[in-house]
UniProtKB/Swiss-Prot annotation:
Recorded coiled-coil stretches: none
Tissue specificity statement from the Swiss-Prot or TrEMBL entry: Predominantly expressed in long bones during embryonic development. Expressed in monocytes (at protein level).
UniProt cross-references to InterPro entries, sorted A to Z: Cystine-knot_cytokine (IPR029034), TGF-b_C (IPR001839), TGF-b_propeptide (IPR001111), TGF-beta-rel (IPR015615), TGFb_CS (IPR017948)
Protein name in UniProt: Growth/differentiation factor 5
Signal peptide: 1-27
Disulfide cross-links: C400-C466, C429-C498, C433-C500
SUPFAM superfamilies (UniProt xref): Cystine-knot cytokines (SSF57501)
Alphabetized UniProt keyword annotations: Cell membrane, Chondrogenesis, Cleavage on pair of basic residues, Cytokine, Disease variant, Disulfide bond, Dwarfism, Glycoprotein, Growth factor, Membrane, Secreted, Signal
Subunit structure: Homodimer; disulfide-linked. Interacts with serine proteases, HTRA1 and HTRA3. Following LPS binding, may form a complex with CXCR4, HSP90AA1 and HSPA8. Interacts with high affinity with NOG; inhibits chondrogenesis. Interacts with high affinity with BMPR1B and lower affinity with BMPR1A; positively regulates chondrocyte differentiation and induces SMAD dependent signaling. Interacts with FBN1 (via N-terminal domain) and FBN2. Interacts with TGFBR3.
Residues of this chain annotated as glycosylated in UniProt: N189
Result after altering W414R: In SYNS2 and BDA1C; reduced interaction with NOG; reduces affinity to BMPR1A; impairs BMP signaling through BMPR1A; impairs chondrogenesis
Gene: GDF5
GO terms under cellular component: extracellular region; extracellular space; plasma membrane
GO biological process: BMP signaling pathway; cell-cell signaling; chondroblast differentiation; chondrocyte differentiation; embryonic limb morphogenesis; forelimb morphogenesis; hindlimb morphogenesis; mesenchymal cell apoptotic process
Length: 501
């Protein structure tokens, strides 16, 4: 009798272990309640292969396991405290989140956090959703840059056009302009002073050479940049070097209160071409200062197509070279008006237009020139608006005559390159050309016939125009596009008389 009872007890014990294992696997809500040492994948696979567990398991002898259906339902509702209890959560009830380690506990009266079932997209490592690669460290997303580029920023101030540093004109060029302008005002022929009345343009070039460092200077090189020189219509060239009065320490004593020295001017040797002697002259005394003028036209005719002109100066006394500094030719710390000056005289065959110089300073086409003139006009609009005086009203019944026209280059914004004059009286012609035409209007035969036809039938023939019949030139001292000071005489700048044409 004892052996059957023992076998029955063993069977009950094995059934109990098997049911507890199955209940543990099927009843765990998440990984946090799985026993240690079990693998989720294996447990799920075993759960799918096994048949569903019957609610009522009969024990031998007709007794049900766990107190029948009533005990099973009780354990399903609230038997979480019992190990191995089988619980089945409701379908509509969301799963409860387990509390995080160290996290705050839910407050009384507030429902616990729940986990909603949502579809989750798995993104490969190193890639953003949508197949985009993540930005590199330190880089800025292109969408951010594009957004910043589209955003309207603060208005930018218009940049002023680049202006070169102001050029100080040589004193000789200012003196030359005053002399020739006075001759024009006095009625004299100023062109006589310009190479036998043929030249109307003088271009000046400032020396760019420097003396060698040393206690004695026996040779000086004078260098001039002539790359921007107009090569047509050249008539002459000269070199002007200022000789200052030397100090008593630099001038040795000599009989007669002075000493005689010879100056030799030659071209600089280059390559296979040796130096060519240009001029030799004597310096009788060193008690005063003055300009040494050398005519170098014969040499310059062969070198006018070069971009640079180089000349050498030496001083000889009693058959040996002497220090040029002791003769007053020291170039150290000289001002602009004291530097050596190279002058080129010329006259172009075609009539020069003032418009060409404006074109050379502003651009290469006419459109650019007009834009330059418009910009200069806008800069001076405020000063012009504040000018005193009103323009006289037009008298349409007045006959053709010369009227005042004052030109101010400073108001036009050209005072940065025009040195003199800054203003002048140009005059203009205004009025009617009616029949009969007066003799002082100097009408042509065609103008007389046209005026007669206009008086007979105004609709078929237009009237003649009041235009300048005689114009005179003016001289202008200006800075060209290469920053060289130029004296030039421009024709047809002032109206002298008006007529009908």
């Amino acid at each position: 009798m004892r052996l059957p009872k023992l076998l029955t007890f063993l069977l009950w014990y094995l059934a109990w272990l098997d049911l507890e294992f199955i209940c543990t696997v099927l009843g765990a809500p998440d990984l946090g309640q799985r026993p240690q040492g079990t693998r989720p994948g294996l447990a799920k696979a075993e759960a799918k292969e096994r048949p569903p567990l019957a609610r009522n398991v009969f024990r031998p002898g007709g007794h049900s396991y766990g107190g029948g259906a009533t005990n099973a339902n009780a354990r399903a509702k609230g038997g979480t405290g019992q190990t191995g209890g089988l619980t089945q959560p409701k379908k509509d009830e969301p799963k409860k989140l387990p509390p995080r380690p160290g996290g705050p506990e839910p407050k009384p009266g507030h429902p616990p956090q729940t986990r909603q079932a949502t579809a989750r997209t798995v993104t490969p490592k190193g890639q953003l959703p949508g197949g985009k690669a993540p930005p590199k460290a330190g880089s800025v997303p292109s969408s951010f840059l594009l957004k910043k580029a589209r955003e309207p920023g603060p208005p930018r101030e218009p940049k002023e056009p680049f202006r070169p540093p102001p050029i100080t004109p040589h004193e000789y060029m200012l003196s030359l302009y005053r002399t020739l302008s006075d001759a024009d005002r006095k009625g004299g022929n100023s062109s006589v002073k310009l190479e036998a009345g043929l030249a109307n343009t003088i271009t000046s070039f400032i020396d760019k050479g420097q003396d060698d460092r040393g206690p004695v200077v026996r040779k000086q090189r004078y260098v001039f940049d002539i790359s921007a020189l107009e090569k047509d219509g050249l008539l002459g060239a000269e070199l002007r070097i200022l000789r200052k009065k030397p100090s008593d320490t630099a001038k040795p004593a000599a009989p007669g209160g002075g000493r005689a020295a010879q100056l030799k001017l030659s071209s600089c040797p280059s390559g296979r071409q040796p130096a060519a002697l240009l001029d030799v002259r004597s310096v009788p005394g060193l008690d005063g200062s003055g300009w040494e003028v050398f005519d170098i036209w014969k040499l310059f005719r062969n070198f006018k197509n070069s971009a640079q002109l180089c000349l050498e100066l030496e001083a000889w006394e009693r058959g040996r070279a002497v220090d040029l500094r002791g003769l007053g030719f020291d170039r150290a710390a000289r001002q602009v008006h004291e530097k050596a000056l190279f002058l080129v005289f010329g006259r172009t065959k075609k009539r020069d237009l003032f418009f060409n110089e404006i074109k050379a300073r502003s651009g290469q086409d006419d459109k650019t020139v007009y834009e330059y003139l418009f910009s200069q006009r806008r800069k001076r609009r405020a000063p012009l608006a504040t000018r005193q005086g009103k323009r006289p009203s037009k008298n349409l019944k007045a006959r053709c005559s010369r009227k005042a026209l004052h030109v101010n280059f400073k108001d036009m914004g050209w005072d940065d390159w025009i040195i003199a004059p800054l203003e002048y009286e140009a005059f203009h012609c205004e009025g009617l050309c009616e029949f009969p035409l007066r003799s002082h209007l100097e009408p042509t035969n065609h103008a007389v016939i046209q005026t007669l036809m206009n008086s007979m039938d105004p609709e078929s023939t237009p009237p003649t125009c009041c235009v300048p019949t005689r114009l005179s030139p003016i001289s202008i001292l200006f800075i060209d596009s290469a920053n060289n000071v130029v004296y030039k005489q421009y024709e047809d700048m002032v109206v002298e008389s008006c007529g009908c044409r």
